């Protein structure tokens, strides 16, 4: 009985060590809603040390949209550190998001006669540039932090993340911004 138990333990241990001999999934591509890309972004994340998952890394992404006369573009760049083992990691990161906003210009009349014709001055305005915090024009930079959880399979494959993403700029600090992402680790 002891021999059988030792053989099973030896074979099982060999399979486990064999499964971990392959390359670690130190790179991933993912889509994120909210987070450092502000509205949404598509990202590439990699570890500087290809032999360890719980190490320093970097993330670069891009996102944007155009709806009517409004458009938005973002380019998040962050340095991050993963803490954990196996598939579960706590993430801390810090970076900047370059973004540009083009808001629609609109005009309106301040005074009308009894027939509904404009008799006052025609006012033309462009809506303010804001994304949660006021910003001083566009293009601009927004500082971002990343505090979150990542699940990365040891053999690669489907990965997901959820994070709290405080944002800041010269006009303030907003601690309650968040993001959720899904992607593929390889």
Segments and roles (model prediction):
Residues 6, 18, 30-31, 134, ...:
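A general structural-boundary detector
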Residues 20-74:
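Short glycine/proline- and aromatic-enriched beta-strand/turn motifs that initiate or cap beta-hairpins
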Residues 7-8, 38-40, 51, 86, ...:
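A broad, structure-centric signal for solvent-exposed, well-ordered loop/edge residues
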Residues 1-23, 182, 186:
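Bacterial Sec-dependent N-terminal signal peptides
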Residues 5-7, 14, 28, 117, ...:
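Residue-level marker of intrinsically disordered, low-complexity segments enriched
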């Amino acid at each position: 009985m002891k021999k059988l138990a030792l053989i099973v333990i030896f074979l099982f241990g060999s399979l486990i060590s064999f499964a971990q001999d392959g390359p670690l999934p130190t790179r991933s591509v993912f889509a994120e809603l909210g987070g450092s890309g502000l509205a949404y972004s598509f990202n590439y994340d990699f570890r500087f040390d290809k032999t360890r998952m719980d190490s320093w890394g970097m993330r670069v992404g891009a996102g944007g949209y155009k709806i009517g006369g409004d458009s938005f573009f973002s380019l998040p760049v962050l340095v991050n550190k993963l803490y954990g083992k196996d598939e579960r990691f706590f993430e801390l990161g810090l970076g900047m998001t370059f973004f540009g906003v083009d808001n629609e210009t609109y005009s309106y009349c301040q005074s009308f006669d009894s027939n509904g014709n404009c008799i006052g001055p025609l006012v033309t305005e462009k809506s303010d540039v804001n994304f949660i915090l006021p910003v001083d024009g566009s293009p601009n930079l927004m500082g971002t932090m990343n505090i979150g959880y990542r699940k990365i399979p040891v053999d690669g494959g489907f990965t997901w993340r959820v994070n709290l993403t405080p944002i800041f700029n010269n006009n303030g600090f907003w601690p309650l911004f968040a993001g959720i992402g899904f992607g593929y680790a390889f």
